[in-house]
């Protein structure tokens, strides 16, 4: 491609609503099942679910929210997922059922990401697509290895970062960084033979 000057964008970046969550966890196969006919789900009752985990998400205005997933083993190799949004149970959001292969411990259902809608007070609803495809069920304690939601609040630029491969990023106050370009790098067989000609320019 054409080599040209790198232009670093300045100013703010707008908020981006969360739309996807990649979630990877192991569920303990030895956990006792909870009978939903006698113990209905209640987020305030820890005996009504097996495990829980919270994710931070953002709405279209950049407001921060919390989505908590409550996992309940309901029978052998079957788990139910209920959700709260900012601490409130979501009566209009159906539970997700996770089913695992009894021989391999790998997820067999659902085979595609699940989209869950959460209503906000002032911003557009958050349609969050949750991918459980890499979850497992083995005889070891509940553990989460990936809890990655996209989205972020609006932010101001606060710096520039250059990676080892020459990629140049603008960095922002919300922790995001955006690629601006890449510095052309070259390797010289005799670095000691380089001669400085001006500033950061060298000749061999």
State what each model feature region is.
Residues 1-204:
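Small/polar low-complexity and glycine-rich loop motifs
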């Amino acid at each position: 491609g054409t080599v040209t000057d790198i232009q670093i964008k300045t100013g703010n970046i707008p908020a981006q609503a969360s739309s996807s969550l990649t979630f990877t966890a192991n569920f303990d196969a030895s956990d006792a099942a909870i009978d939903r006919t006698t113990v209905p789900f209640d987020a305030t009752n820890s005996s009504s679910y097996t495990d829980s985990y919270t994710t931070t998400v953002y709405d279209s205005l950049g407001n921060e929210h919390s989505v908590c997933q409550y996992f309940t083993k309901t029978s052998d190799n079957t788990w139910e997922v209920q959700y709260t949004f900012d601490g409130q149970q979501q009566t209009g959001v159906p539970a997700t059922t996770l089913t695992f292969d009894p021989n391999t411990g790998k997820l067999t259902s659902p085979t595609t990401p699940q989209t869950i809608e959460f209503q906000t007070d002032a911003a557009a609803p958050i349609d969050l697509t949750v991918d459980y495809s890499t979850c497992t069920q083995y005889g070891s304690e509940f553990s989460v290895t990936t809890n990655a939601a996209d989205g972020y609040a609006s932010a101001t630029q606060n710096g520039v970062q250059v990676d080892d491969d020459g990629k140049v990023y603008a960095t922002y106050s919300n922790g995001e960084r955006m690629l601006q370009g890449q510095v052309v790098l070259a390797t010289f067989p005799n670095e000691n033979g380089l001669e400085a000609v001006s500033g950061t320019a060298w000749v061999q």
